[in-house]
Amino acid sequence: MKPVETENRKVVVVGLGKSGLATARFLLRRGALVTITDQASEARLGDLVVSARDLGATLELGGHQDSTFLSADYIVVSPGVPETLAPLKKAAEKGIPVMGEMELAARFVTKPVAAVTGTNGKTTVTTLLGDMLKASGRQVFVGGNIGAPLIGFADKGENADMAVVEVSSFQLDTSETFRPHVAVLLNIAEDHLARYVDFNAYVRSKGRIFENQEADDVAVINGADFHVLQASKGIRSRKLTFNAGKNTQDGAVIGDTAVEIVTAGTKTATISVTSPLMRARHNMENIAAATLAALAMGATVEGIQAAVDGFQGLRHRLEYVASIDDVHYFDDSKATNPDAVRRALEFFTSRVVLLLGGEDKGCDYGVLKNVIRERARAVVLFGAAKEKIRMAINGSVSLWDAGSMAEAVRRAHELAAPGDAVLLSPACSSFDSYESYAHRGDDFCNAVKKLKEGDHARG
């Protein structure tokens, strides 16, 4: 794969965020003439502007200029920048190359890369896979759509002998030559439909993770997910499956308390799982996928087991917060689509008071109606999408409104019975009221803390 030229090339970087800043740094170090453009104002971007100017980049803020795009040698877009952006379309029509940050990095990375994508579980599997390799004595860069962008590994690749990256559909959309040695596709369910023409376009986007793999590469796929199986049809790499049942020939068989690795029909390793949270079905799938990828990247069984034993899950993912009057509070703010909510509800054996709402992503919330009827005691709705959700799940259980997170938590506590769980698992993005899902989760945790400290506790 031939690296792109950088010396004295005019490069436009679209989006001044963590990815855009890292991209600009990489290019400027290699002699490029970099302009960073962003629709946001200088005041809103704050310290990022200072950092970009310190690097020596030219800045165009508060909007995009067609002339800047049309005079570029090539354009690098940050994750999440839509392909429909007018100046981008004009540049592409003129034949100016447009690529994503990850694609640029792929042109320069020479060490093995494991890439993880899927609608749900990406961050958990990426983190756990990194832990497994580190516990096996490997020097590993972990990043991508989480943490440091892959371009940072291309910039300082000598610090690690391999990379593990989380990859979003947005990043795959702007990649042409990206070839991970190990590609993991966890699951595909409705998400980001406000961006894609239809669900099939989203499925195709996820399947691009396998596009450039060859016979000596490895694909780790969910054998029980119809859309994953469709997306991985006809790929050239060697397939390892998880979640496909006891007849698996090459892959992982998931039990209640362990994951068995099978090679050519023979069991070759067993990974035990002791944590109740990690024994949740979706986390057992995550462990199976991470284990297969780790082995393919050279991890040891001992290192994998040590990583699983020490892994306590990530923040805002079915995270236990507190108990008040025998009602147990869980923060699952990262659940930003209906499938993630379904998985969360299936974890609980008790009744759940569910907090749903936020900014709509174009998903069908009606798929939650049955599982809510089976698992929930009540639902508290909040945020911009609450009326759409109400129409979709009406008739399942009692529905209540809240104007704020604090009100939602108070209402949930009033509705819950002893032994119940109160679960923030919103099925929506957070951007109607919050900077991020983490900001929303922190608000929930703070509301629970105030409830615990205040006068609202019963009895």
Curated annotation (Swiss-Prot):
GO CC annotation, single: cytoplasm
Organism from which the protein derives: Desulfosudis oleivorans (strain DSM 6200 / JCM 39069 / Hxd3)
InterPro entries hit by this protein: Mur-like_cat_sf, Mur_ligase_C, Mur_ligase_C_dom_sf, Mur_ligase_cen, MurD
Keywords: ATP-binding, Cell cycle, Cell division, Cell shape, Cell wall biogenesis/degradation, Cytoplasm, Ligase, Nucleotide-binding, Peptidoglycan synthesis
Residue numbers binding ATP: 118-124
Localisation per UniProt entry: Cytoplasm
Catalytic activity, EC: 6.3.2.9
Record GO terms (molecular function): ATP binding; UDP-N-acetylmuramoylalanine-D-glutamate ligase activity
Pathway recorded for this protein: Cell wall biogenesis; peptidoglycan biosynthesis
Record field: catalytic activity: UDP-N-acetyl-alpha-D-muramoyl-L-alanine + D-glutamate + ATP = UDP-N-acetyl-alpha-D-muramoyl-L-alanyl-D-glutamate + ADP + phosphate + H(+)
One GO process term, biological-process aspect: cell division
Family: Belongs to the MurCDEF family.
Principal EC category: ligase
UniProt xrefs under Pfam families: Mur_ligase_C, Mur_ligase_M, MurD-like_N
Protein name as catalogued: UDP-N-acetylmuramoylalanine--D-glutamate ligase
UniProt keyword annotation of Cell wall biogenesis/degradation present: yes
Gene: murD
Its biological purpose: Cell wall formation. Catalyzes the addition of glutamate to the nucleotide precursor UDP-N-acetylmuramoyl-L-alanine (UMA).
PANTHER family given in the database record: UDP-N-ACETYLMURAMOYLALANINE--D-GLUTAMATE LIGASE
